[in-house]
Every structure is written in C-alpha cells, then in structure tokens.
Amino acid sequence: MKQAFRVALSVLMLFVAVAHAEVRIEITQGVNTARPIGVVPFKWDGPGAAPEDIGGIVAADLRNSGKFNPIDRARLPQQPTSVAEVQPAAWTALGIDAVVVGQVQPGADGSYTVSYQLVDTSGNPGAVLAQNQFKVTKQWLRYAAHSASDESFEKLTAIKGAFRTRIAYVVQTNGGQFPYELRVSDYDGYNQFVVHRSPQPLMSPAWSPDGSKVAYVTFESGKSALVIQTLANGAIRQVASFPRHNGAPSFSPDGSKLAFALSKTGSLNIYVMDIGSGQISQITDGRYNSTEPTWFPDSQSLAYTSDQAGRPQIYKIGVNGGTAQRITWEGAQNQDADVSSDGKSMVMISTNSGAQHVARQDLVTGAVQKLTDTFLDETPSLAPNGTMVIYSSTQGMGSVLQLVSTDGRFKARLPATDGQVKFPAWSPYL
C-alpha cells in the first residue's frame, strides 16, 4: 500500500498543472438492477467539516462498478458509526445483506486515518466481512476511499477491485498553441493531469504493465512517431519513426516487448520491439494491412486486425513464428480488439449494417454479444479485472468517453466540457 502511494505521489508531484475541465461519470443505465448495498457516511472525528466525503466516494465506486446499487442516504434506515451500532434487521428489511461503515480521524501531524468495516447483515448478522485502516495525507484521501472500495468489492464478488486504476486519453481542445493533450485521470475522472501537450495530433496511448510509462503516437515532427514517456520524470524515448505510418503501440503483459504497426514497406504490418535491446522483429508480412495489435496474457501471441479476407477481421498469431488464425466470424467486420487479462475473452468494434458498436467475444465458445447502442464507437479498452470497458463514441458534434459493463447491463458516460475526447486506455492495477 505504501509503495503504491509513493509511486502515484511521484506522478502527482511532476504534473502539478491539473487540467481545469475534468470528466465525471454519469450513469445512464443499469444501476437499478444491481445488488443493493448500504454505505453509511463515515464518522468524522475532527473539527468543522470533513475534507472529503469518504462514504460518498465508496458508494460511487460500488455504483460505478455496475454490480451494486447503494441505497440513497435519505433512505438509510440508520446511520451507524461503528460495527456495534449496525442493526442487521433494519437493513435486511430493505433487501440489503451488507453495509459499509467507517471513520475518519485527523492526526496532529496533518495526516488522516481512514478506517472502514464491511458488515454482514444477513448470513452471519453483525459479522465483519472485511476491514482495514489507512493513514494518509489530505491529497490521498480519495485513494484511501478507493482502497476501501476495492477491498469491499473483492470480498463481496471474489473479483479484484479496479477503483485505484487510471485512464489515459487524448483531448483535442478548441484553438490554442497546443490543441492536443494526452491526459491521465483516476478511473472516475478525478485528479486529472496533462502528460503531454502538442500542436499536432496525439493518438493511441498504451500503458506499460507496471503503470509507470505510456506509449503513444505523436505527429510533432511532421510525421508519425512512436514514443514511450515515463510518468515519474516526463522523459520521452522515441522508439519508431520510420517512413509512412508508425502506430498502434501495445506493451506485452510481461513488460519486455512493444508491439506496433508500421507501413515502411508499403502495407501495414505488425512488428515487435524488444524494449531492452531495441531490436525490432517483423511478425506479419503481406500485401494486406495488419494493425491494432493486442497481447494475450502469455506475452507470446497477439490478436490484431487484418483485411486479408477483404474486410477487417481479427486474427491471432505467435510472435515467434507460425500461421495466423482468424478468430472473428460474426459481423461484416471486426477490429480494434482488447484481450482480457485471463485470455478467455476480448472486446472489439463490430460493424453490422453500417453501425459500429462495442462487442464482446468469448474466445472459448466463440459467442459474441453486442454491448453498446451508442454511435460510431471506437477504441475499446478493458478494465484490468475484465468487468468494464471504456471507449469513445460520437455524441452531437464531438467525441466523448463511455463506459459499459462486459455483460452489457450497466452503462455510463464521462463527458468533458473543453474538447473532444478520444483513444481511452485503462491502466493496469496500480
């Protein structure tokens, strides 16, 4: 926990200029069918008002997961401040089988101790299912709340929580010297900061598996180039600037390789670079176009988009040789895949009758499920726990970020007010 705080703190210290117009999650569908839960306002043991509404953040996290529906505060049957004060029968009468209570204690040194308890109200009434406490400074109160959310979520679902993750995305603002910005924020849009500003387009950010670096495409030199930027110090390393197109970077899960697409020989092909040595190997070779690589968890094989069958479809190939295998067969065309961390499924953009939507394919059975009904969906990116997808879509005259659960039931959007938002990429666990 302390190590995670230090890593993230180094990032915040570098990027002190926070962008003014932050994105925020607005739920549009699905929360009413989720599992009800109680999240009580955390007891504040200090003078005046609490510096953060920790209970509100935990409730928002659980609601944003699409799996829980925290009861409105106005409907809380009681507001216990400790485990001993929880009256299980009052909660089970509302169909609630678990309650989160907590406390925030200010310290003389300027720190805060955030404590929480997840209490069973049904199976073993009054039993503590999970609990923890975090001593943090003021700027880390939201992180402490996300930590409580992660632990509660995992205890109740057996799925690792992803509330301490971040998203990277590109914002195109209106006018100014640097209209293109690569930004990073918490998964819920808070604590947004600018990683890089450019007078020319930025595209396709991709996270390193340890969350310390972001690869992306820049056109600042007048042509496309692939770079890797270290978040802690801002250092930028150029890794590819060949003739024609350099694009679609993707880190291998083990962090040793970077896959990308180059068109230096005419058509687009997939290449893989050993990050340590800089050696580049060509993976695909043909007159057709192959692009948008994404890794399987073994770091030895890739899914990618190719038009070798006439229209874009998704294929799988080993990075050490072998024949490519087509893995999408439903829909007029499929592209821009992101493989889940367990390798059992992927999300992609599927086009039928001229409409392109986010779809999920089970890689074991081949079954495909359409997840969205928004317009001109692009660049889906999975949360590291595989429960949610972030993507961009066209809304009105611009592009915005959207969220959808991988079962298609929960939907939300993250509107921004200062430009078009594209190319979202969900971070690994941080």
Curated annotation (Swiss-Prot):
Pfam families: PD40 (PF07676), TolB_N (PF04052). GO terms for biological process: cell division; protein import. Keywords: Cell cycle, Cell division, Periplasm, Signal. Its main location: periplasm. Part of the Tol-Pal system, which plays a role in outer membrane invagination during cell division and is important for maintaining outer membrane integrity. TolB occupies a key intermediary position in the Tol-Pal system because it communicates directly with both membrane-embedded components, Pal in the outer membrane and TolA in the inner membrane. NCBIfam families: propeller_TolB (TIGR02800). This is Tol-Pal system protein TolB.
